[in-house]
Amino acid sequence: MYAPPGNAVPANRRRRGGTALPKQPERSLASALPGALSITALCTALAEPAWLRVHGGTCPRQELGVADVLGYIDDKLIDEFCINSQSILLLRVIAAFCFLGILCSLTAFLLDVFGPKHPALKITRRYAFAHILTVLQCATVIGFCYWASELILSLQQQHKKYHGSLIYVTFAISFYLVAGAGGASILATAANLLRHYPTEEEEQALELLSEMEESSETYPADYDIANQFQPPPAYTP
């Protein structure tokens, strides 16, 4: 006996009427947002000329930064004892680490936004390797900034404007922007590391269910599996 075709419920309708399969996207907007803030802060720090503030020496400039040592260097900065060869080298190293930090942060941001499924890229994003590198770059920049400030302070103390001048060197806005970029990258790292991810077995099961769902959706909505088994024609001698 064959059941009438009209009594069977289409398989595709049964699937569509049920609950949707759980999706596990690799995107992470929670870490992409602080990653974007980190990129913005580092780019602004490079564009901002104020890294160190100088007071009390013979240098007429009140603010110094990496923009003063990239490309052409004004001879007055050296002649008026604002900077020397060592501080020039340190400021260039600071600029190089800022560029590396921007590159690492941009890589992490793209991984968080697009969420690639490639195994190597997936591991890189889940364990926040690019964000961690950004934090290290920012910490390195902060360390070199302190070193450069000590060198410039020593140079100003050797060339005081007046005998009793109070000389000090403080950090300017770019220094704090780099520190803020490092803090934002720490938040992005925490968002990636604290997020719950499915195990390998769960991922395989989800991929299998997704493939089954996609294959069922290739049939028309009114397709009935029972219709493909038509009863044989009546026997005629």
Curated annotation (Swiss-Prot):
GO terms for biological process: negative regulation of cell population proliferation; negative regulation of TOR signaling; regulation of TOR signaling. The keyword Transferase does not apply. Keywords: Cell membrane, Membrane, Transmembrane, Transmembrane helix. It is found in: Cell membrane. Residues 1-23 are annotated as: Disordered. GO terms for cellular component: membrane; plasma membrane. InterPro entries: TMEM127 (IPR033331), TMEM127_TM (IPR046795). The chain crosses the membrane at residues 94-114, 128-148, 166-186. It is a multi-pass membrane protein. Pfam families: TMEM127 (PF20517). Signal peptide: none annotated. Its main location: membrane. It comes from the Eukaryota. PANTHER family: TRANSMEMBRANE PROTEIN 127. Controls cell proliferation acting as a negative regulator of TOR signaling pathway mediated by mTORC1. Belongs to the TMEM127 family. This is Transmembrane protein 127. It comes from Danio rerio.
